[in-house]
Amino acid sequence: MAAMTYHLDVVSAEKKMFSGVVQKIQVTGSEGELGIFPGHAPLLTAIKPGMIRIVKQFGEEEFIYLSGGILEVQPSVVIVLADTAIRGLDLDEARALESKRKAEAHINNSHGDVDYAQASAELAKAIAKLRVIELTKKAM
């Protein structure tokens, strides 16, 4: 018997990043981690910066960095509308490490709530990119 699946589209402002049949996905929603399996209840939620883990129809995994966006779950299709989406293979590790270093320095030198909040957001994005790079390397 074939595994239960559904259709997934991951779209950014620039292009369609993924379109295909999947077994499940994992993504960080506004209220926490979400695992979307076939037959999931309809849902519309914001996505926090982080990654989407895609388990394709035959079990292969793909990781994509998302800077945020919207997740829509319908009975037979799931759509991710991302602000920015970058495949793990396309991320630059040296650049992500430099962004992380700069954000950490900014946090240590921040002089107000706004500075700290912005630096914290930049740090979270850099860490998410590094995690996507790490998981993409492991999956290869």
Curated annotation (Swiss-Prot):
Superkingdom, natural source: Bacteria
GO molecular function, one term: proton-transporting ATP synthase activity, rotational mechanism
HAMAP family cross-referenced by the UniProt entry: ATP_synth_epsil_bac
Bilayer topology term: Peripheral membrane protein
Keywords from the UniProt entry: ATP synthesis, Cell inner membrane, Cell membrane, CF(1), Hydrogen ion transport, Ion transport, Membrane, Transport
Organism name: Yersinia pestis
Assigned protein family: Belongs to the ATPase epsilon chain family.
Protein name: ATP synthase epsilon chain
Top-level taxonomy: Bacteria, Pseudomonadati, Pseudomonadota, Gammaproteobacteria, Enterobacterales
NCBIfam families: ATP_synt_epsi (TIGR01216), PRK00571.1-4 (NF001847)
